[in-house]
Amino acid sequence: MPVLRKIIIYALGKRREYFMDIKTPFRYDHVGSFLRPEYLKQARAEFFDGKITRDELTAVENKAITELVKKQKELGYHAITDGEFRRGSWHLDFMWAFDGVSHSATDRGLPFHDEAAILDDTYLTGKVGMTGVHPFVEHFKFLKQFEDENTVVKQTIPAPAQFLAQFAMPFGWKDASEFYATREELAKDIAEGYKKVIKDL
């Protein structure tokens, strides 16, 4: 049954309101991120240590995702995801695939549940864009094979506002300001990149 939803977006000091007629095939949903099985975490560690190839890691990821999809269906989920099993970070992996975005290892950790989450430093090395095909598109195609009459595939991506915040906040703007005169210009390029990714999906 169609549901009319009012969406309010605040960005860069401006408020925008949208009304969307959304037809949802179910009444509940889940975020889409699941705990990684130990064998997948082990394979990822071996990949970063140079002990296995990218293709070997992908094969392990495919196995873990296939098992996860089966479990989601058994539990009666109507929206299925890959659990974000191909990612090291729920948001940064998506950003790193954009033109102009680079990252490097860091020893500094960010506090997360009384632990230090070691995430790569992420910064701009040029204008943000998406001239190629984002890797998440292939991830989505792999998952699509599992759709059936009771399930639909959901691709999770960070919100554009999360992407913008990564570089518009003071710690990120230092690098970003070398390529953008204003945050509004950065936001526009991010939006164009997202449009390309979503179109390809």
Where are these regions (language model features)?
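Domain-level signal for soluble alpha/beta catalytic cores
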Residues: 16-200
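Short, Lys/Arg-enriched N-terminal segments with co-localized hydrophobic residues
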Residues: 6-19
